[in-house]
């Protein structure tokens, strides 16, 4: 019972975070946020490159 309640709470929080992220994207992103996304994508692609080269 307690576990299912915890899972429900986590699911609600996750959905709220997703909604908030969508709101922020709809409001328009600042250059700083776009820069962070670019760095994340670069880090992801370098990690993928390392995996394929091994």
From Swiss-Prot:
Biased segments, Polar residues type: 42-54
**Highest classification ranks of the organism:** Bacteria, Bacillati, Bacillota, Bacilli, Bacillales
Q: Where are the stretches annotated Disordered?
A: 23-54
Return the Basic and acidic residues bias intervals.
Answer: 23-35
This protein is called what? Uncharacterized protein YxzL
């Amino acid at each position: 019972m307690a576990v299912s309640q915890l899972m429900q709470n986590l699911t609600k929080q996750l959905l709220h975070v997703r909604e908030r992220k969508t709101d922020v994207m709809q409001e328009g992103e600042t250059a700083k946020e776009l820069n962070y996304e670019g760095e994340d994508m670069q880090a992801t692609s370098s990690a993928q490159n390392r995996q394929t080269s091994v």
